[in-house]
Design a protein with these regions (language model features):
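NAD(P)-dependent dehydrogenase/reductase Rossmann-like domain
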Residues: 1-2, 10-199
Length: 199
């Protein structure tokens, strides 16, 4: 039913308590619809509407970068390092970080991974999360790099940014090689030995 909203049972055992919880949930939904803060969501960290508007594209790009890095990296990963440069370092990047972690884990753990449990799911796999906000010049107004580092310190990475007046999401680096690829659809990544006679 499209008009039904369900919430988890919160332990309100009396009629009055259940009514109060119902009113509180309705007020929270009204707040979100009027541009307020997302509070007490079941599968999303709390964010105000302005943060959702500003970070929404980065959340989407981050998820795609996480998925890409997981697919180009081997199964044994010791550290997942996420580095931010540019304007984004001034913001709370928690939702972007969780989107990257969720994207990285999606093909491993399936749909059971969400924005709330992604950090814990990563930890359970023995992967250390490392978040860096860099003030160094990246050459872009905003850049996100995701690195999967193996136990022997081999790094597999992808970086993304937004290009042009319309802020089109682009993958600009894969494993340290500069590229410019739209961050959408399917992407075939091949690596071969760079030697004469090899195509």
């Amino acid at each position: 039913l499209p008009n039904v909203v369900l919430t988890p049972h919160l332990g309100a055992s009396t009629t009055e308590a259940q009514e109060a919880v119902g009113i509180e949930v309705a007020e929270q939904i009204a707040d979100v619809l009027n541009g307020g803060v997302i509070r007490n969501a079941v599968n999303m960290p709390s964010m105000d509407a302005n943060a959702v508007k500003v970070l929404g594209p980065s959340i989407d790009l981050g998820g795609k970068l996480g998925t890409l890095v997981q697919q180009i990296a081997p199964p044994q990963i010791a550290t997942l390092r996420i580095t931010y440069w540019g304007k984004i370092v001034e913001l709370d990047v928690n939702a972007v970080t969780r989107a990257i972690q969720r994207g990285f884990l999606r093909r491993i753990s399936g749909d059971s991974v969400n924005f709330v449990n992604a950090p814990v799911a990563l930890e359970r796999l023995g992967v250390r999360a490392e978040i860096v906000k860099s003030t160094d010049d990246s050459g872009y107004s905003e850049l996100i790099r995701v690195e999967a580092i193996t136990p022997d310190d081999t790094t597999f990475s992808a970086s993304g940014t937004f290009i042009g007046k319309s802020n089109q999401p682009r993958i600009v680096s894969i494993n340290g090689r500069e590229v410019e690829v739209a961050a959408e659809g399917k992407l075939l990544v091949l690596e071969n030995l760079d030697q004469p006679g090899m195509v």
